[in-house]
């Protein structure tokens, strides 16, 4: 496995652990969201919204951790061509999608719904999502090269 993929796996685990902590915080005290994220409209944050946010964050955390454990899930042993690789890449792409979804969510809360301001509490998840998207897109190239080289060895 390439060094880049090992770093990406470590990054995904770290982000997953942080997300698990945010999940606990969302369930423990919903004022966490109004004080750190949705600062432009803190009155809209209630317990139900915080728990929903917590469940979403927990789901993202689990998906990201599973991808870190099995980052090659997108390259099956029987991959014969690029189409086969794409068809078997669900967990990697779902993980990538969790970061796109987080990025779109926070950007829309800031620029469309105006419930969040560009504070450090919002900038942090925006930067994590952006760096993660970039890293996972680069990781796709490494995984593709590995899959193609493994395929050549088998033939």
Question: What are the functions of these language-model segments?
Answer:
Residues 130-151, 155:
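Membrane-water interface at the C-terminal end of transmembrane alpha helices
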């Amino acid at each position: 496995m390439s060094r880049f993929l090992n770093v990406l796996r470590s990054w995904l685990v770290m982000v997953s652990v942080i997300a698990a902590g945010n999940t606990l915080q969302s369930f423990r005290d919903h004022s966490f969201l109004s004080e750190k994220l949705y600062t432009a409209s803190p009155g809209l944050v209630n317990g139900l919204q915080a728990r929903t946010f917590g469940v979403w964050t927990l789901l993202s955390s689990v998906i990201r951790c599973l991808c870190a454990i099995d980052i090659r899930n997108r390259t099956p042993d029987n991959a014969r061509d690029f189409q086969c690789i794409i068809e078997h890449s669900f967990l990697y792409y779902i993980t990538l999608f969790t970061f796109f979804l987080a990025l779109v969510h926070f950007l829309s809360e800031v620029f469309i719904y105006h419930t969040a301001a560009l504070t450090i509490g919002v900038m942090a998840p925006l930067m994590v999502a952006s760096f993660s998207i970039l890293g996972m897109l680069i990781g796709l190239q490494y995984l593709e090269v590995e899959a193609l080289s493994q395929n050549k060895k088998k033939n």
